[in-house]
Amino acid sequence: ALSSAASDVYKRQYQNAGNSIRKCGDINHEYEEKIFSPESVFHLPETINRVIKILRSINEKTFIVIDAIRNPYEVKFFRDRYSAFHLVSINAPDKDRKKYLQNVHKFTSDQLEDLDIRESGRKSNINTSEENAPYKEEKKDAYFEFISQNVKRCIEISDIHLFNARNELENHNILKAQLAWYISLMLHPGLITPTAMERVMQIAFTAKLNSGCLSRQVGAVITDINNSVKAIGWNDVAKGQVPCSLRSLDGVMNSFDKITYSEFERNDKNFREKARNKLLTFKNKGDKISGYNFSYCFKTLKNSVDLDKNQVHTRALHAEENAFLQISKYGGIGIEGGKLYTTASPCELCAKKAYQLGIKDIVFIDPYPGIAISHILNIGNAKPNLVQFRGAIGRSYHKIYEQIMPYKDELDFLGGVN
C-alpha cells in the first residue's frame, strides 16, 4: 500500500511539474495562481530539441526516441520541425491495461480513475478532506488544454498505432514484431505494401477532412468481409444544408438567410440573445481576433440557453450513420457480416445501427468515452468484434509506404547494373 501511494504521489508531482512549466515556464507549487504565459507552452519541447541538436552534433546519423509525449501542442512543435517525426501510440485493451496497472504497479481503482481524468484533458481537483480521495472534474480554465496532459487527443493525432497485448506480462513478441515492421519502413520506405486495415482506415482518415464540424472531424468506411469499400461518410450536416464552419454569428444576427439559418435560429428570442452576447464577446477582443469567421456550434449555444447537455441538438450526422445512409441512398448492396472502420469509435446511437445492420467487425482508433461498448455492443448473440486499429495513418502512411525510387531501379543502381 505504501509503494502504491508513493507511486501515485510521484506521478502527480511530475504531472503538476509539467503543467507548471507549460503555464509559467518553471516549476512552482502555486502555478495554478500564476498568469498564463503562452510562450511557456513550448518550454519542454524546446528543451528536448536542444538535447536533440547536441546529440546530432556528436553523431551525424542519430535516431531519437522521446518517451513520452502527452500534450498535443508538443506534438505540433516537433512535427513542424522534423519531417521524419512520427508520433507512435502504443495501445492496449482497457481491461488489460487496468489489470496490468493494478497487478504490476499496484494501482487502486480510485488511483486508476484519477490517472484517467488527469491524462484525458479533463481538469480535476483533489478533495483534500479525504486521504487518497479521487480527483473530481471541475470547470476548465481557458488555457487549461494548452498546459495539461491529453493522452486521448495524442492517440487521436498519432501517426502510427501499435497494439501491445497486456494479457501475458512477459510476452512482448507482438509488440516487437510491429516495431520491427515500422522501424524498417522508416529506414527504407516502400519495402512492403500497407495492410488492408491501414488501406481502409487511410480512406476514412482522408474522408474526415470533408467535415465542417467545429469540434471534431471523424471519417468512416463500410466494407464487406474482404475489405472491399461499399460506402464512406464523415460527420457533417445533411446534404443541402450549410456546414457549421461556413456559418457565423454575424450571419445569424444580420442576414436572416433562410437557406443558411433555420427558422428557430432566426426567430427564437432566447437563442438570439445568447448569440448576440457571444458575438459581442468576440468583437470586444479587438485586433486579437480580427479576420476570424465567428462560427458557432448550434448544439453548444442551444444547451447554454437550456442549461442542459442534450446531444440531440447537434446539426450534423455522425460519420458512421452517414456512411450507412449512403448505401441506402444510392441503392447499395447488403453489408451484413461486413466491417465498419471509424477514425473515432461509434457512439451509443451509431453502435445500435451497426448492430442492427449485422456489422461483424468494428475497427476504431479512439475509444468512445460513453457506454456504447459495454452496454450496446457487448450483449446478445450477434456481438461484433471490436478491433483497435493497428498501423500507420495520415502523413506517416505516405512517408513510410511511398518508395523513394522504384525498387527495381534501386537494386540496379546498388548492383551496378547498366
Language-model regions, residue ranges each:
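Short beta-strand scaffold segments in enzyme catalytic cores
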Residues: V218-I232
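Glycine-rich phosphate-binding loop used to anchor ATP phosphates in small-molecule kinases
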Residues: Y14-D80
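Small-molecule kinase domains that catalyze NTP-dependent phosphoryl transfer to phosphate-bearing small molecules
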Residues: N103-L175
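Short, basic/aromatic recognition patches
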Residues: I192-V218
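Short, compositionally biased leader-like segments
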Residues: N167-Q202
